[in-house]
Amino acid sequence: DPQKPIYFNGKYHYYYLYNRGYPKGNGTEWRHYVSDDLVHWTDEGVAIPKYTNPDGDIWTGSVVVDKENTAGFGKNALVAIVTQPSAKDKKQEQYLWYSTDKGKSFKFYSGNPVMPNPGTDDFRDPKVIWDDQDNKWVMVMAEGSKIGFYESDNLKDWHYTSGFFPEQTGMVECPDLYMMRASDGTNKWVLGASANGKPWGKPNTYAYWTGSFDGKEFKADQTEAQWLDYGFDWYGGVTFEDSKSTDPLEKRYALAWMNNWDYANNTPTMKNGFNGTDSVIREIRLKEQDGTYSLVSQPIEALEQLTVSTDEIEDQDVNGSKTLSITGDTYQLDTDLSWSELKNAGVRLRESEDQKRHIDVGIFAEDGYAYVNRAATNQPDKSNTYVESKAPYDV
């Protein structure tokens, strides 16, 4: 899982769950990377190691900059609240770690756990934000099929305020809460979570709801979740502020774990000696259309600095199919598709010389969806359940 990046001392700091002993060993810890541009990253090593206290390994949580020293560890200390299984009965509880060396290492708080388990199996993935209106910390927590809301003045003492009970999302993990300014100028709160919508024909990715938040309770504009990603490999997603922007509500950034629990240990990279990849960072904005507010996203512009050459193709009229003389291992394709009678219009990418390996991307106009089909790749799902992802599109 990625942990929500923070901007501190002129750099983005990014922590993620790392298991140095995989697949023979077990247990995760927090590894630390820094970046100036969200494209190039420098490895700073493990910041919160596992098994250094009687409780279990380090799971997902979040880290904040305590600008006003509310926790008492010093002004601008970094404070992380993470889930660990307790030493006594392996129940999921929340533990506080703090850093006074700019995030390079963290110390275990002597008063842990700051949130003992209330008697539930699922009690994890705390996401902490600062509430400017009420001058307090707010936390959202994954609690099975529920998202719990909590508040604190000092990051140590937490009090339950409300619960949000989504429909047709199954077990939720890695909740998210933030405000955005929509395209029509309206400010909206967004509550997100990685959810499991497969039983209802929905994705297993990042579900979200727009609505209002009064500091204690979130009220959704509509009960049905929307989805930021319709693919198969965008789970454990986090969003974070564009800290360099003069208007931080205008857009956010997002990234996620590129995997799926149904085949998490069967990825193609296993033959290369590792398993686990996080996505490129995307930019997200909130768009209003016909009274509904929805997140839209695209890869960040900073990726364009990696471009070393550009090819432009003139307009092509196609009746059937046509092969273009463009090759490459890594590229960005920008194209406009228009059609008159075709039911299926698209492009075939990364085709091998024998034409047996390729990825198909296109629009099935008759049924109103865009698709990505990876059947002819070394895709990890041997059940062929996760072969073609479909997403609605605006005409």
From Swiss-Prot:
What InterPro entries is this protein classified in? Answer: ConA-like_dom_sf (IPR013320), Glyco_hydro_32 (IPR001362), Glyco_hydro_32_C (IPR013189), Glyco_hydro_32_N (IPR013148), Glyco_hydro_beta-prop_sf (IPR023296)
| Binding annotation for substrate | W59, T60, R124, D125, E173, W261
Q: What EC number is given for this enzyme? A: 3.2.1.64
Keywords, sorted A to Z: Carbohydrate metabolism, Glycosidase, Hydrolase, Membrane, Transmembrane
Kindly report the protein's main subcellular placement as a broad class. Answer: membrane
Any single GO CC term annotated in Swiss-Prot or TrEMBL for this entry: membrane
Temperature-activity note from the record: Optimum temperature is 55 degrees Celsius.
What does the record give as the reaction this protein catalyses? Answer: Hydrolysis of (2->6)-beta-D-fructofuranan, to remove successive disaccharide residues as levanbiose, i.e. 6-(beta-D-fructofuranosyl)-D-fructose, from the end of the chain
List the catalytic residues.
D1
Residues forming coiled coils: none
A Pfam family this chain is assigned to: Glyco_hydro_32C
Report the membrane topology from the UniProt record.
Single-pass membrane protein
Keyword Transmembrane carried by entry = yes
Q: Which GO terms describe its molecular function?
A: 2,6-beta-fructan 6-levanbiohydrolase activity; sucrose alpha-glucosidase activity
**What family classification does the UniProt entry report for this protein?**
Belongs to the glycosyl hydrolase 32 family.
Query: What PANTHER family does the annotation carry?
Result: EXOINULINASE INUD (AFU_ORTHOLOGUE AFUA_5G00480) (PTHR42800:SF1)
Known function: Catalyzes the degradation of levan mainly into levanbiose (difructose). Can also hydrolyze inulin.
UniProt name for this protein: Levanbiose-producing levanase
